[in-house]
Amino acid sequence: MIALEERGAETNRMAAISAVVHTVAISREGKVKLERVDIAHDTGFSLVNPLSVKKQLEGQIIWFYNDAMHQAITIKDGHVVENNFNKFRISHIDEAPPEINIRFFKTGHWLLGMGHDRFTSVQSAIGDAIFQITGKRFRDLPYGRQDLSWT
């Protein structure tokens, strides 16, 4: 995903320039694995704490994988099934991509945020990989509730 946006000091929008490549594998049984993620990310005028930003970006990749594969709220008989943390599925550490490569570049533009809006491309990358590998196109998340097996 490449996101470009005109930015300046007076805007109220979150903005950043980034390019992200996701390498996704799907076993014949339908197990999805993010094998590698490569990120090039704008630092704006300056980056005060690169390690902090790097960890923020890594966390976002893992959390958006979680969104794509597991997160859902189920209503049964008028009640929420996942009504406590022990019933709400989240990703485990072994589901994290073993390789996340992050490179920063400086555009000299204003950087207005490093929040959780950076890598929604994880869901679409996994969805596209599912389609390319299995021939099945899903339009609803989480993908983990779908039959992802293929022959």
Segments predicted by a language model, with ranges:
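Cofactor-binding beta-sheet edge motifs in enzyme active sites
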Residues: 1-151
